[in-house]
């Protein structure tokens, strides 16, 4: 792990216009042309999309993937995103990397593979579906 000294971070909150309860995410400028956005616990809506266009990274909930998501429809039931929803949004908004989290625990052994493969059907960038406590560098 590299330690960067003398870095200035600009972090600001964004109203996520959440449906269930008032929520705020954040955008962090971590270099002159790179941003990391945390999108909270609900589906990202059109009012929020303008803030994340061209971000280097987004961290988003993705409750389910594939056929399971199509059948259960977590967007309608709980206002949680699906892998497909996040991947299509990221592709449309020119986001370079997505981190998918806040998912079901139905198949933890294969979840990472399932989520990444599903996202790659709709998105050309990098996809991360970390296990709890897994770490990786954000560059």
Predicted ranges, named:
Residues 1-50, 132-139:
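Core dinuclear metal-dependent hydrolase active-site scaffold
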Residues 43-133:
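Cap/insert and terminal regions of metallo-dependent hydrolase folds
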């Amino acid at each position: 792990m590299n330690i960067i000294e003398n870095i200035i971070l600009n972090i600001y909150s964004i109203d996520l216009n959440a449906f269930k309860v008032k929520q705020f995410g954040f955008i962090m400028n971590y270099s002159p042309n790179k941003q990391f956005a945390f999108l909270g616990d609900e589906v990202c809506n059109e009012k929020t999309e303008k803030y994340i266009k061209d971000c280097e990274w987004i961290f988003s909930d993705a409750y389910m993937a594939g056929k399971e998501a199509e059948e259960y429809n977590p967007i309608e039931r709980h206002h949680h995103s699906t892998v497909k929803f996040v991947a299509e949004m990221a592709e449309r908004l020119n986001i370079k990397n997505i981190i998918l989290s806040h998912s079901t625990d139905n198949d933890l052994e294969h979840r990472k593979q399932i989520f990444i493969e599903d996202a790659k059907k709709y998105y050309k960038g990098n996809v991360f579906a970390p296990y709890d406590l897994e770490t990786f560098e954000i560059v």
